[in-house]
Amino acid sequence: MTDFALNAEVRSDLGKGASRRLRRNVSMVPAVIYGGDKAPQSISLLAKDLAKLLENEAAFSHVLAVNVAGATENVVIKALQRHPAKGFVLHADFQRVVAGQKLTAHVPLHFINEATAVGVKQQGGEISHTINEVEVSCLPKDLPEFIEVDMAAVEVGQTVHMSDLKLPKGVELVALAHGNDLAVSNIHASRVKAEDEGAAE
């Protein structure tokens, strides 16, 4: 397990104008911590520290320690607002983590055995990913770093759905809980192969 930590300052100058000044003047990112039994807290983070943290995919599915004014808040990343053209973070939302209380977080999918999948190796198909992350609900101690999608037995024309995923103990998919069994990945006939067969006919 990697430790993820950020240092933050309490932000008292609030509002959109203040947020713009913060980003422009000192390379700081405005953020808010909310949830649990405490009031929301406005904070500011060094942009370079946040950018470095986000380089690690696992940061999105780990409990982070945010140090604010001598106290540590355990949080998960809830939402990031990015610049539409340049991609850097404009604002961050963090949700407090309370031991014994379920949280929701976005966890990346790791696709395995793609090259050796039946539909690829034996049938010449191509894999498409419909989604690359899922929202999970679990206790903080059960939060997985990622969820594997095993493509080994998938054939051409078959689709992997959320209900096909093997989840760690204590982890639920939010979409499934709401009755939405979304497609995750599929293997379809190669366009080149389909064109060749069409020409042969």
UniProtKB/Swiss-Prot annotation:
Keywords linked to the UniProt accession: Ribonucleoprotein, Ribosomal protein, RNA-binding, rRNA-binding
GO molecular function term, any single one: structural constituent of ribosome
Source organism per UniProt: Ectopseudomonas mendocina (strain ymp) (Pseudomonas mendocina)
InterPro entries linked to this entry: Rbsml_bL25/Gln-tRNA_synth_N, Ribosomal_bL25/Gln-tRNA_synth, Ribosomal_bL25_b-dom, Ribosomal_bL25_C, Ribosomal_bL25_long, Ribosomal_L25_dom, Ribosomal_uL5_bac-type
Listed Gene3D superfamilies: Ribosomal protein L25, beta domain (2.170.120.20), Ribosomal Protein L25, Chain P (2.40.240.10)
A matching Pfam family: Ribosomal_L25p
Annotated gene: rplY
Protein family per UniProt: Belongs to the bacterial ribosomal protein bL25 family. CTC subfamily.
Record-level GO BP terms: translation
GO cellular component: cytosolic large ribosomal subunit
Descriptive protein name: Large ribosomal subunit protein bL25
Subunit structure: Part of the 50S ribosomal subunit; part of the 5S rRNA/L5/L18/L25 subcomplex. Contacts the 5S rRNA. Binds to the 5S rRNA independently of L5 and L18.
Lineage top rank: taxon: Bacteria
Protein task: This is one of the proteins that binds to the 5S RNA in the ribosome where it forms part of the central protuberance.
